[in-house]
């Protein structure tokens, strides 16, 4: 029974730490994180929803490498980093929250949902990898 339990019930911290390197390798061609946590997208052709999710995911992953970088990202950081107006950013963020790809941790603060990261980074590579490379 313990084998089944370990197979099915995961510790969220262990789950995401185990795959951090793999996920970072998959998104590193598309985004970089500054030492202060700032977001630098390396691809312009990405749609706004994917850009926002990539920024939130990258920030989350960066925190796993360097705890001085916050895992959450604010609405203002998203707007500034991605050059998006507030109404566009909030609309796309709402879609991502409804789709359970990200979660709001408090007003104007968002974080990636660990068990959604693999699906997202695979989608980004499939959708933008060849166009970008």
Whereabouts are the PLM-identified features?
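A short, conserved structural fragment
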Residues: 97-107
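Short, well-structured alpha-helical interface segments that form or flank functional binding sites
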Residues: 47-51, 73, 88-91
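Minor-groove-contacting beta-hairpin "wing" of winged helix-turn-helix DNA-binding domains
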Residues: 72, 108-114
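Short amphipathic alpha-helical interaction segments
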Residues: 83-98
